[in-house]
Amino acid sequence: MSVLCPLPCPDYLRSAEMTEVMMSTPAMDEIGLSPRKDGLSYQIFPDPSNFDCYCKLKDRLPSIVVEPTEGDVESGELRWPPEEFLVQEEEEEESCEDAKEDNKEQ
């Protein structure tokens, strides 16, 4: 036979019920995080070690590599270094190599 409490229930009965609920639930350590049935798991808070790494990387600009093309230059397009500069540089290298060979022969 159960005794039902009338509407104005004394506080000691409420606290006894709450104590029973608290005692019957598992502790947070026992619950743990396990993967869901569909195999997907999630993390509510980010891993602190990943956050430190992210903070270091977010201040850097991304590196952009532009590969030169081997085609005709469209009108108005600027190239660096200019072709004249490359030709002069190649001629200087050839003259330096010739001078080195002449010095070795002597």
Curated annotation (Swiss-Prot):
Source organism superkingdom: Eukaryota
Segments of skewed composition (Acidic residues): 86-96
InterPro entries from the UniProt entry: LBH (IPR013294), LBH_dom (IPR038990), LBH_dom_prot (IPR042945)
Start-end of Basic and acidic residues biased regions: 97-106
GO cellular component, one term: cytoplasm
Chain residue ranges for the region called Disordered: 69-106
GO biological process, one term: positive regulation of DNA-templated transcription
Keywords associated with the record: Cytoplasm, Nucleus, Transcription, Transcription regulation
Segments forming domain LBH: 18-105
Main localization category: nucleus
Xref: Pfam families: Lbh
Subcellular location: Nucleus; Cytoplasm
Annotated function: Transcriptional activator.
PANTHER family: PROTEIN LBH, PROTEIN LBH-RELATED
Family statement: Belongs to the LBH family.
Annotated protein name in UniProt: Protein LBH
